[in-house]
Amino acid sequence: MSSYKYYDLIRKPIITEKTTTLSEQNKYAFYVDKFAEKLTIKKAIEEIFKVKVKKVNILNVKGKKKRFKGIIGTQINRKKAIVTLEKDHNIDFAGGIK
């Protein structure tokens, strides 16, 4: 699979207070395509960030119900991947920020 398809597979990293504490344990969270599988997520992370992946966990996150001007709607359903890296590898999302 070419690298441009890997960029379509990994939607965006999840950067919250909870995920920054997970990064101390070499775990990083990403929103991924809802049809993505563990093996393809592992290959995509290794190709994009040039790191060695140890394990991938996947969660399906159901969209919340929201109300706007009396109209009830739902947010989209998402798939979340929590990627565990090998000991000597890490991903720096804030590279160059001072």
From Swiss-Prot:
One of the early assembly proteins it binds 23S rRNA. One of the proteins that surrounds the polypeptide exit tunnel on the outside of the ribosome. Forms the main docking site for trigger factor binding to the ribosome. Keywords: Ribonucleoprotein, Ribosomal protein, RNA-binding, rRNA-binding. NCBIfam families: PRK05738.1-3 (NF004359), PRK05738.2-4 (NF004363). Belongs to the universal ribosomal protein uL23 family. The gene is rplW. One of its GO terms (biological process) is translation. This is Large ribosomal subunit protein uL23. InterPro entries: Nucleotide-bd_a/b_plait_sf, Ribosomal_uL23-like, Ribosomal_uL23/eL15/eS24_sf. Part of the 50S ribosomal subunit. Contacts protein L29, and trigger factor when it is bound to the ribosome. GO terms for molecular function: rRNA binding; structural constituent of ribosome. GO terms for cellular component: ribonucleoprotein complex; ribosome. Transmembrane segments: none annotated. It holds the Pfam family Ribosomal_L23.
